Design a protein with these regions (language model features):
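Conserved N-terminal glycine/acidic-rich loop preference
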Residues: 2-32, 51-83, 102
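General small-molecule cofactor/ligand-binding pocket signal
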Residues: 47, 111-115, 190-191
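A generic local structural motif
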Residues: 7-10, 135-137, 149-151, 175-177, ...
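Feature captures the FAD/FMN-dependent oxidoreductase FAD-binding
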Residues: 86-169
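Glycine-rich active-site loop/strand segments that organize a redox cofactor
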Residues: 54-98, 236-254
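Rossmann-like dinucleotide-binding core of oxidoreductases
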Residues: 13-18, 22-23, 28, 32-33, ...
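FAD-dinucleotide binding site
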Residues: 18, 40-47, 54-56, 61-62, ...
Length: 254
């Protein structure tokens, strides 16, 4: 049972008892920093906040068929934690689990606050601390203050340092242009960032707009699911074969 005194003693709950560090984002960047903080400053009080309902960042948000890394995992992964699989590229689910294990080793799971959106952080010059507003019960896609929206609460956190590892785009909603005449389209328009878990592709005609990294991984996966796929692109991409097994990394692991 927690009391009001317990809450006051909680690190970050007051200017008199601030955190040493608040990390925003529980993806690769945030967990990488958590590891180094845990190694270099074991006595620090720190927390990790993420607006999503699980860690992983990009690898939690994106769940479309075929999602994988674009770079080899020997260079994309953590330098302190070798990629445990033999594959050159990492699948989305494997990368997310890889991040989770790194977070566990760093002690970040015990300091992780999910569904906690950092609404703002302001430097208090008099106190030499950051005053951070963390909103729970809502996400970055919602508007209004906690008092204006039912179920949302605010927690003020005080910290000596703030590190933003949240990336540069919104995880709540991807870029979605409106196409002329789309109101007359009888089919379904889907953004890979909000891929439905129950989507049936077998026997469907699918048009993939664009030929970037997402399209290159999505198209063959849709073909394997039985869809008839057409790629609509402005400029053709250069595509070449890539070994599925990383023989160099496997050699160094011996």
């Amino acid at each position: 049972m927690s009391t009001s005194d317990d809450k006051q003693r909680r690190p970050g709950s007051s200017p008199e008892n601030p955190l040493d560090l608040l990390i925003v984002g529980a993806g690769i960047s945030g967990i990488d920093l958590a590891h180094h903080v845990n190694q270099a400053f074991p006595h620090w009080n720190w927390e990790v906040h993420d607006s999503a309902d699980d860690l992983g960042g990009t690898w939690h948000t994106f769940r479309y068929p075929g999602i994988r890394s674009d770079s080899d995992m020997a260079t994309f992964g953590f330098p302190f934690r070798p990629w445990p699989h033999g594959s050159t590229l990492g699948g989305g689910a494997d990368i997310k689990e890889y991040i989770r294990e790194a977070a566990r080793s760093a002690g970040a799971l015990d300091r992780l606050h999910l569904r906690s959106w950092v609404a703002d952080s302001n430097w208090d010059s008099a106190r030499q601390l950051y005053r951070i507003t963390c909103v729970t019960g809502g996400g970055e896609d919602e508007t209004g203050t906690a008092g204006e929206r039912s179920g949302r609460t605010e927690r003020i956190v005080w910290s000596r340092r703030v590190h933003y590892g949240s990336g540069y785009y919104s995880h709540a909603e991807g870029y979605r242009p409106e196409f002329p005449g789309e109101a007359d389209f009888a089919g379904r328009i889907i953004h890979p960032q909000q891929w439905p878990d129950d989507l049936e592709c077998a026997g469907k005609k699918v048009v993939v707009i664009g030929s970037g990294a997402t399209a290159v991984t999505l198209l063959p996966a849709l073909e394997e699911l039985g869809a008839e796929v057409t790629m609509l692109q402005r400029t053709p991409s250069y595509i070449g074969p890539l070994p599925t097994r990383d023989r160099i990394s496997a050699f160094w692991k011996r």
